[in-house]
Amino acid sequence: MLLSALVSALNGALAKILTDDLSSMELVFFRNVLGVFIILYTLKHTPPTLTGGKFHLLFMRGFFGFSAMILFFYTIATIPLGEAITLNKTSPLFVSILAFYLLKEHLSKRAILALLVGFFGIIFITKPFGMSISYEHFLGILGGFFAAAAYATIKKIKDIYDTRVIMLSFMGVGTLFPIIFFMLAPYVNEPESLSFLFAEFQGEYEFKVWVFIGFMALISTLSQWLLTKAYSMSKASIIGVISYTNIPFSIGFGWMLGDAFPDFWTFTGIGLIILGGILVSKSK
């Protein structure tokens, strides 16, 4: 799991490097398109056995996952890598809230404490001492919420859909939606705040950019494989705790790429979110 966390942080660093040449929407497209073909190949050779039957939930999983990813890549491009990764890691806190309201799961006292701790962590990172937070930090938090919504949806369909079909819903939407936005981009006069959604597809990149794209796709696949392997070999609560080590890894990679080192308030916020995530993991 520690290796998975390191690889995940490296994947974030590669994405940040690519933001100099690719838009956030292009990153989402290239992140998913290869996976679609791989999953389709496996489904052709080993058809799924589960019946499914709730396509709307399958689509919602894909939509929430796509929304989380586009916001994640946007925040990687606009704020320090460590902060972007940390805000994305608020998803376990949001999962607890969604599970309580939508799935009627019990919320223990430890989980409630974790939510409060995590909330204060968000406050310290975004530093809204002037009663406002930056647009980029807000989208980072929203990305964490969408990731949580995707995880909550998986809980509803994991017993009726093959895992590969669930993955395909995410990667399929993550491939189709960018194509739609690419087609609309020349005809939409979007506000500056939404420019990351309607960036035009370039298609012509230097060779080194293609190398980084291919490397990112491989690293992403390796990270998912290591994560799956870790969950199959250890308790989910332990894995959840160790997964937060990708935050210090990300801070280190971000610093090497030119990010400013986190100040006292940011470090405090990161620590509180990690603590909140650990408490949530231990409460399960």
Regions from the PLM with identified roles:
Residues 5-13, 40, 62, 66-70, ...:
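Hydrophobic/small/kink-forming positions within alpha-helical transmembrane segments
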Residues 13-16, 24, 39, 132-195, ...:
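Transmembrane alpha-helical segments that form core, pore/gating elements
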Residues 110-127, 265-282:
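Hydrophobic transmembrane alpha-helices of multi-pass small-molecule transport proteins
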Residues 30, 85-90, 157-173, 221-255:
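Helix-helix packing/entry segments at the starts of transmembrane helices
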Residues 91-113, 248-267:
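C-terminal transmembrane-helix exit sites in multi-pass transporters
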Residues 1-2, 48-73, 135-142, 193-222:
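Loop-to-transmembrane-helix transition segments
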Residues 20-35, 74-91, 133-146, 205-218, ...:
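Structural signature of hydrophobic alpha-helical transmembrane segments
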Residues 1, 53-63, 107-120, 136-142, ...:
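Cytoplasmic-side transmembrane-helix entry/capping segments in multi-pass membrane proteins
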